[in-house]
Amino acid sequence: MGTARFLSAVLLLSVLLMVTFPALLSAEYHDGRVDICSLPPDSGDCLRFFEMWYFDGTTCTKFVYGGYGGNDNRFPTEKACMKRCAKA
């Protein structure tokens, strides 16, 4: 049972890295920090249905968020998204 549990943990870690690493590579960095507005939309890991907003590089667009996980390019309103991400 210990080997199966270990292999499950390794598989889970591998999947998480495959999902997270490309998103980090596509993000822009400013002062060594990730610019959250450049991250791709990420619906997260759960199956709930929350209408949220993400910045697509030009404007804020609706998407469905599952309620857990995802990244920080996620805002409760279009106004909050534009305030954080739109360049004046």
From Swiss-Prot:
A GO term from the CC aspect: extracellular space
Proregion positions: 28-33
Alphabetical list of InterPro entries matching this protein: Kunitz_BPTI, Kunitz_BPTI_sf, TFPI/VKTCI-like
Tissue expression summary: Expressed by the venom gland.
Region forming the signal peptide: 1-27
Protein family according to the UniProt entry: Belongs to the venom Kunitz-type family. 03 (sub-Kunitz) subfamily.
This protein's name: Kunitz-type U15-theraphotoxin-Hs1c
Native source organism of the sequence: Cyriopagopus schmidti (Chinese bird spider)
